[in-house]
Amino acid sequence: MKDLDRRNFLKLGLLSTAAALSTNSVNAAGSGKDSSGGIGNVPLQKYVAKKYTNLLGGALTGFSDEQLKAHFALYEGYITKINDLEARIKNFDTNNPDTINYRGWHLEQTSMLNGAVLHELYFGNLGAANKEPKGSLKKMINRDFGSLQSFIGHMKTVGKIFHGWSLAALNYRTGKINVYGLERHNLNVPTMVSPILVLDVYEHAYMIDYGTDRKKYLDAFVMNVDWKPVEERLEHALSIPFGEAVTV
């Protein structure tokens, strides 16, 4: 298949997937007044899609509005779907011996939840307003990878060889930053880590602008990283003690 034909084919598939995810939703996990249940914090009753219009209008070099809007629509579909799934799971009668659908909902729940949250982290670390890491982030990158160039090299290499995500995260067990590869939203997901930099390498993230040329997309991503939210995520993660005690 020619690259242009493949690009149009993938574009159509992305838009169709986003539309499918956005249909057949139910009102999410509760419609009454919020209640903390005596715990003190009031939980959200449903997921609400965040807006990333600040990334449009040429704010990102190498990312067209068409590409970004299609990507936003896909993310919004994940939000719709996770609300639907969590409502179905909550309302399931656990005395019902027919658990085939229940199992399917749980399998899909992790995929839709991770799909929603990882996209929020991905869009959140784009913007290019702050082009260099600073403070604790810079020090830890140099400590754990030797240099920013080496760190970026690991992010991009993982992005080349995995189908889903490349993400840097603070490992609570060791206190170090590691780069992890996710084959799917809910496959190869590490535990006891807090993501700080997230890179979407599914074809839907770049196919409109770059077709199958993932290398050019990876270069564009690096050029458009906003390091400020990455620093803020790390500082938040560091506020939680790490080490052997986390697995008590």
Q: Which residues does each predicted region cover?
A:
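Hydrophobic h-region of N-terminal signal peptides that target proteins for export
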Residues: 18-23
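C-terminal segment of N-terminal export signals and the immediately downstream linker at the start
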Residues: 24-58
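All-alpha RGS (Regulator of G-protein Signaling) helical domain and cognate RGS-like helical scaffolds
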Residues: 40-47, 52, 62, 71-73, ...
